[in-house]
Every structure is written in C-alpha cells, then in structure tokens.
Amino acid sequence: MKPVKSTAEILAFKVLNRDINKTWVDWAVEMLMAGFDTENLAILAGEFEPYNQFQLQDLTTKVLSELQLDLTDKDQTIKNYACFLIDKSLVGELDNFKVLDILKDICIELDYEKYLYDFYSLYFAKDDLSYSENQWYWDGATRENIEKIITDYFTNWKSNCLTN
C-alpha cells in the first residue's frame, strides 16, 4: 500500500516543525480510508480544535513511526513536498503563484537553500511584473512570458521528481 499523496506535505510539515492543524487530521482520515490502520493514526483522525501542540507533536511522531515513514533526509522530504505542490499547480488545483510563495518562504526559512532558490527568484520576478514592466530576478522574464517560464520550470521540476 502506498501512502496518500498529501503525505509529502505532512512529512515536510514535520521536518519543518510546523504546528499540527486540521490538515494533519484530514490526512489521518485519508490514510485510514486508504487502508492504513494504526491506533495512533485513528487517535489523530479524531482530534479537533483547539489542538494541544505538545500532545500532538508526540502523537504525530508516533504515527509517522508506526507507518514507517522516513524523515531522515530533510532535503529529500522538502523536494518531495515541492513535487506535491507543483503537481497540484499543474493540474489546476493550486495557483502557481501560491506554490512559489510557499516554496519561497521555505527557501528563506532554510537559509536560502540552493535547490529552492529558483522558486524564490521566480516568485519575486512574477511579483515585480505584477506592478512593473521590469524585474531583476529571472533573466529574460517579462509580463508576456512569466507564466510560461513558471509552467516550464514546474514541468521540468516534476520530470525530475519522477526520477527520484
């Protein structure tokens, strides 16, 4: 059995030490519906607000351990999350600017991690072009071609996801 697609997001949240929220609970429900069944996963699926972060951080660690989900390679976990977000963008479920915003923030959080820096640059190129004719982040990007540049970059990134 393969974990549900949103597992990439949950693992990224864990390695980035994000607060537990409804996204985690929804993921736990999805996992149960997909046939995964552990005691702690069922407990997580039954949680509701307000969330006790101390208790839930411990619970989610147990859930991920029970499901044998690997968190040892932080960079690969983040790359998998980028693949998840890009996939959602390419099928129209998530706006590409929102994807760039999320990955730009992670890039900053991770001290301008090299493998995320293009997302940072594309975010600010598109942002600048939303109110100006000029941008200095992505060579050759204009208002006329920024969407294609982003889509091509996402498509290329996704093709690399499939080889990992």
Language model regions located:
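Acidic, Ser/Pro/Thr-rich low-complexity regulatory regions
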Residues: 1-164
